[in-house]
Amino acid sequence: MANYTAADIKALRERTGAGMMDVKKALDEANGDAEKAIEIIRIKGLKGATKREGRSTAEGLVAAKVNGGVGVMIEVNCETDFVAKADKFIQLADKVLNVAVESGAADLETLLATEVDGKPLSEVVVEEGAVLGEKVVVRRISRVEGTTVDAYLHKTSKDLPAQVGVLFAVDGEGEAAATAAHDIAVHVAAMAPNYLTREDVPAELVESERRIAEETAKAEGKPEAALSKIVEGRVTGFYKGEVLVDQAFAKDSKKTVAQVLEEAGVKATAVTRFRVGN
């Protein structure tokens, strides 16, 4: 007769996130000792970790937190959307985010090397992944600073945690600054600009766009005298699509993002956008 109860199985499942049969087998092997059973579950899970190393991790979530004038955002990946919405996975992401905020880490290598309960965070992630039965990866981290920082998280499906996240910082304080920062963060989530200002666009990319615009205009038979104006117009169109401050504001397309910032009396200082898997 088993020397454990249904309540013991339930409690162990809640503590480990393991399936019912795995928990029962571990309790049998441990002769009902819950702590020993947890150790068995973890060992068996870690043995399978090497088999999971080559697996694709295209699902997951984005998490972010603002503390004063500092915003931190992470992306944590797993293999399936089933695990992505699991409480244990979401709790792990929260743990990683808290470590990122408290440690001051600004890059992935530093974050993963940060000690948590006497071991590197990277080991904690592998162990938790073993319990979940999937490869789990902390893919990236962003840390931005500003007088006012907004973090916006967007769900692309009501059944999943946030798949898109934005950190947006401005040099300015007060209600107007906070409102502008939030509204523009929402805009960034939807419009996905690749650059904050024109100065951030690599010169070689601009020159490439210019050459393409010129060759396209010539192929269309545009008059030589009009080429310069046509090329500049098309390069400006490129900026309007790729550069945040040049984009039409999603909330009011009659304004540019630059105008929204000017009306609020603030200057944009940093922006980061994560989308799971991209």
Swiss-Prot record:
Pfam families: EF_TS. Transmembrane segments: none annotated. The keyword Transmembrane does not apply. Keywords: Cytoplasm, Elongation factor, Protein biosynthesis. Disulfide bonds: none annotated. It comes from the Bacteria. The keyword Magnesium does not apply. Coiled coil: none annotated. One of its GO terms (cellular component) is cytoplasm. It is found in: Cytoplasm. Residues 80-83 are annotated as: Involved in Mg(2+) ion dislocation from EF-Tu. GO terms for molecular function: translation elongation factor activity. Gene3D superfamilies: 1.10.286.20, DNA helicase RuvA subunit, C-terminal domain (1.10.8.10), Elongation factor Ts, dimerisation domain (3.30.479.20). Associates with the EF-Tu.GDP complex and induces the exchange of GDP to GTP. It remains bound to the aminoacyl-tRNA.EF-Tu.GTP complex up to the GTP hydrolysis stage on the ribosome. HAMAP family: EF_Ts. Belongs to the EF-Ts family. This is Elongation factor Ts. The lineage of its organism: Bacteria, Bacillati, Actinomycetota, Actinomycetes, Micrococcales. The gene is tsf.
